[in-house]
Amino acid sequence: MTNILRPTNFEDVIGQEDVVKRLKINSAGCKISGSVMPHVLIDGPPGLGKTTISSAIANELQVDMYTCNAANLRSVKSILPYLMGISPRAVLFIDEIHRLPKLVEEFLYPVMEDFKMSISSGEETEEMELPQFTLVGATTSGGSLSQPFYDRFTIKEHLNFYSTDELAKLARLNAKKMGLTVSDRDLIEIAKRSKGTPRILNARLKWYQNYILSVGNDGIDAIFNTQGIDCFGMDVYDRLYIEVLEKNVGNPLGIKSISSLTGIAVETIENSIEPYLVREGYAVRTQKGRALGKTRRK
């Protein structure tokens, strides 16, 4: 399903227009000149298309793409196979790049700048030249990268949440790919329940399809109420988070306290729950902690 719905080039990407425009200019210029595209850092909440855009970069450049997750690169040794096997002008995509250990970050400094790496074997150190390539890093926490590492990315882009109209347009396109007929009204309602995030939209579409096929069309509210999704797109964890803040009005809570009270992992709160709720005004982050925002559930 992911492969069916994921765009393969910039022309097929819906939303993030300014980001896509700049990356198209960069990739087209590099392709014409035959030069290597500068290293790229893409920041933003989960599910907004960082992997999709990285893949589009490689496809636009017509080069190979190598993919890895920083969570699996716990030592210099673990990244060597990617570097030693990389082809000229290729894209090396590292997801969750903020998870790289400092030692691996520092090892990549000369790799990114000069395309050289030093490998120690016993008492000897061998310097190897690498083909020039583009490192594309994706992160939900750009501020977690060390400054020297951050500065080595020439191109830095931030992805924003999608509007309801953009998501409805994407829903129409993806529903067609899925062979699913959806009314314009339902497309809008699915988009409203997707928290500004394409990945969530695709999950909502799949649930909608399965419900229609197995139960029937009982109406959009019944379809998503069964899944525990309200008209704002909030699930049980979002509501639990808000309920904790409602019970502590005037008493901002630290994230660890919220985690303890809700049973939700800190990382899940930071990456999956708070970005949307803060953006929509349901919650605010203050120096003293998290507090209830001005937006209220109806």
Q: What kind of feature is each model-predicted range?
A:
Residues I188-R193, R199-S214, I242, S257, ...:
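C-terminal helical "lid" of AAA+/P-loop NTPase domains
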Residues M1-R22, D230-F232:
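Dynamic helix-loop-helix/coil hinge segments at AAA+ ATPase domain boundaries and subdomain interfaces
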Residues A28-A70, P81-P88:
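Walker A/P-loop
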Residues S144-M178, D184-K192, A203-R204:
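Conserved AAA+ ATPase core "coupling" helix
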Residues A56-I57, V76, P88-S118, G142-R152:
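Conserved AAA+/SF3 P-loop NTPase catalytic/coupling segment centered on the Walker-B
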